[in-house]
Amino acid sequence: DYVLIESTYGDRFHGERPDYVNKIATVLNDTFSKGGNVVIPSFAVGRTQEMLYFLRIIKKEKMVKNYPNFEVYVDSPLAIEATNIFNKNVTECFDDETKELINKGINPLQFEGLKLSVSSNESIAINQNKVPKVILSASGMCEAGRIRHHLKHNLWKPNSTILFVGYQAVGTLGRSIIEGATTVKLFGEEIAVKAKIETLKGISGHGDQKQLISWLEAM
């Protein structure tokens, strides 16, 4: 028999997991205090659900002091559908810690202030709302999808933050932004990059060497 697996991090170990919740909370506090939005380009499957998990904790622990009732918009039909699949397939999609929450009647991906934008009209309305907010949208590398509209509306604002939570491949719009581009082209327009650019270091959906070997040993 043969087993074919991915091995992106097969030659290394991830090390201690950073405190992503506190990092995100810091970004939210800093940005909301200036009246801006936090725009998060996010992969629709896996990464968006992980961000929702973190954001639920931030809300529950009231970690955003001056704006605790902030709204979170998920603006990606695929991400919304994937989230529904996660919720319907608990045993396959969640780890033991998350299953414990579910057993207590807590949905780890739901919280007050979460808004799901399915239609194009709902998507457009997000940027007409001037209240500080979190916008989760795909694609994660900003090459396509609704995220490009949110970048167009927020990149030029010095009080907003673009928070990257995934790998940005060479040649992508996301890579250009994190490498310090001062302008980018969106929908035929040159958009100045004035927003604060942040990244979550070390976050990955790929298992490291230990995790890959553990998975193989269980077969």
Ranges and model annotations:
Residues 1-219:
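Acidic/His-rich, metal-assisted hydrolase cores and their charged scaffolds
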